[in-house]
Amino acid sequence: MQGNDSHWLPKHITDSSRMTGFSQPISGASRRRKLVLLATGGTVASTWSNAQGSMQDYSVTLAVEDLLPAISKSGSLADFHCVNLFSLPSHDIDCDHLLKIGQVSQAWLDNPEVDGLIITHGTDSLEETAYFLNLTIRSEKPVVVTGAMRPADHPSPDGPANLMGAVAVASSPMASGKGVLVVLNDGILEAGSCSKQHTTGLSAFDGMWEAQIGEVIGGNVLFRSAPTRRHTATSEFTISGLIGFPTVDVIYDHQSARSALYEASVASGCAGIVVAGMGNGSLSAGARVGALLAKE
């Protein structure tokens, strides 16, 4: 029903002659969207490691093909090409993985046979990946990032519904030109504003109302607004030619903060420091000392 391509590297993906792995239509339709499902791991592709079902005791065990039956049961709007890029919990995704996700995504989107892209991802760092892609991907095609709060073998998993919602959005012409979108719990969020607000709840991303620009209601896609900031095709950044990232540390300021963390960052060779400061950009005395040391 679905195609695989172990050659996910851009030099292979950009060859349109390799685009022979799309699934056959699940039900009758004259024009189905051709979507790439790019898997990176996360809870959506995880199963519990023991019978007790601990909230933390599960691991990534499923390929993206294993998630497709849930879509076929409801009738799909698209044909799929599956790419298993990683099988990682998202707290283990680093800058090298992030760069690879961006490069592979861009290569697929550049293929004229592809109508849109869905990325399955763990929710712990989903917002970082979505935001990075929103700044660096050059395409007006729909790009949707989705995941799950519950593992696939949970008695009531949310992954299938999230994936079906992602398919509906990625298949919708209305999603074109809106940048990278996050689809979870029937909400459509813009990547530039979304943030995980709850550790375990199904509505973990729902608290950022300013980020929610639409909904998936009964399989129908409804947009109420559109992102206003530059993104994707109009972004000042691009994935093209990017080969790595400088090391930048994030240091939180707080009462009685010390300058030692700034000194350690500089000594370790970081290229920059982002200070997560207090209201109106205020810094504690220790942070001011550390920032001045780092600036020298």
Where are these regions (language model features)?
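Accessory alpha-helical/coil subdomains and C-terminal extensions
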Residues: 31-34, 38-44, 60-74, 190-280
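Short acidic, glycine-rich surface-loop motifs adjacent to enzyme active sites
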Residues: 111-126, 268-280
